[in-house]
């Protein structure tokens, strides 16, 4: 899994 990709996905969901 790509941690950066997941972080970006989560950040996108939070915003």
From Swiss-Prot:
GO cellular component: extracellular region; membrane; other organism cell membrane
Described function: Cationic linear alpha-helical antimicrobial peptide. It exhibits inhibitory activity against both Gram-positive and Gram-negative bacteria, and moderately stimulates degranulation from the rat peritoneal mast cells. Its mast cell degranulation activity may be related to the activation of G-protein coupled receptors in mast cells as well as interaction with other proteins located in cell endosomal membranes in the mast cells. Binds preferentially to charged lipid membranes as compared with zwitterionic ones.
Tissue-by-tissue expression: Expressed by the venom gland.
Compartment list: Secreted; Target cell membrane
Protein name, UniProt field: Eumenitin
Highest taxon of the lineage: Eukaryota
BP-aspect Gene Ontology terms: defense response to bacterium; innate immune response
An MF annotation (GO) of this entry: toxin activity
Segments crossing the lipid bilayer: none
Alphabetical keyword list: Antibiotic, Antimicrobial, G-protein coupled receptor impairing toxin, Immunity, Innate immunity, Mast cell degranulation, Membrane, Secreted, Target cell membrane, Target membrane, Toxin, Transmembrane
Protein family (similarity comment): Belongs to the MCD family. Eumenitin subfamily.
Keyword Transmembrane attributed: yes
């Amino acid at each position: 899994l790509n941690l950066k990709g997941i972080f970006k996905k989560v950040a996108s969901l939070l915003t």
